């Protein structure tokens, strides 16, 4: 459909980036750290349990692992082990996802605020920011800084508030079902770039194989398109 005149001037007020699996190819590093923890606990992590962890907070991932292994271990000890092992890997092996660096720099160069919205805890995020460039972000929200982590909308609502943006004019870029649910519940427009788990298109999101070639005008077009969809009587795209 053609954009209504009221919506033609809509712009992206902020871009809210997930980190693991979206900006950084770090899910593979989490695989290694989680496998090491499972081994230390005397078991093997199932593929199903690992899929459930994608996009989860540290505490939720530990709970999933303990349940999967059928053990009653100390969550604090497991969390400390996992954090230490992940930190070792983050310091030496982080790499960018295709197109992520280019889009992040383009957003920054255009003067559009970027926020990092991650389920990873603050200490590990600070290590990752050495690779990402902390100067490129106007704000960051970590999994240990919210009461309700993803899939609750709190992380994305918090990020939008920190940069002074209306969530409906923010594009959230995510790779996981939990993160997408969080962003959509907050009212954001979502660009999904699946990493470990397949994501289907929906009226509230676009899906791309990677961020390669994605531009700020592309994100602005998504905001306008979703605004148009909300103005339809049935709330659906036409």
Where are these regions (language model features)?
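Metal-dependent phosphoesterase signature
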Residues: 65-102, 110
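Active-site neighborhood of HAD-like aspartate-dependent phosphohydrolases
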Residues: 2-51
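Short beta->alpha linker loops
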Residues: 29, 53, 57, 81, ...
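Conserved phosphate-coupling serine/threonine residues in phosphotransfer and NTP-handling enzymes
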Residues: 22, 118-120
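Asp-based, Mg2+/Mn2+-dependent phosphohydrolase catalytic module
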Residues: 2-13, 105-108, 112, 121-238
């Amino acid at each position: 459909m053609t954009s209504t005149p009221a919506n033609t001037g809509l712009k992206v007020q902020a871009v809210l980036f997930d980190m693991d699996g979206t900006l950084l190819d770090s899910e593979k590093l989490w695989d290694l750290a989680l496998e090491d923890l499972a081994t230390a606990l005397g078991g093997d992590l199932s593929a199903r349990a690992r899929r459930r962890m994608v996009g989860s907070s540290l505490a939720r991932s530990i709970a999933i692992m303990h349940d999967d292994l059928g053990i009653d271990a100390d969550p604090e000890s497991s969390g400390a082990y996992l954090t230490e092992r992940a930190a070792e890997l983050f310091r030496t092996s982080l790499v960018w996802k295709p197109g992520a660096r280019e889009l992040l720099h383009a957003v920054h160069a255009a003067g559009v605020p970027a926020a990092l919205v991650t389920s990873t805890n603050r200490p590990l995020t600070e290590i990752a920011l050495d690779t990402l460039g902390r100067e490129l972000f106007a704000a960051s929200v970590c999994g240990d800084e919210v009461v309700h982590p993803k899939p609750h909308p709190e992380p994305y609502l918090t990020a939008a508030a920190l940069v002074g943006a209306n969530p409906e004019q923010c594009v959230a870029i995510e790779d996981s079902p939990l993160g997408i649910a969080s962003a959509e519940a907050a009212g954001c427009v979502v660009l999904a770039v699946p990493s470990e788990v397949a994501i289907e298109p929906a009226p509230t999101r676009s899906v791309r194989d990677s961020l390669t070639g994605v531009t700020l005008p592309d994100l602005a077009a998504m905001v306008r398109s979703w605004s148009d969809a909300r103005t339809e009587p049935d709330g659906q795209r036409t």
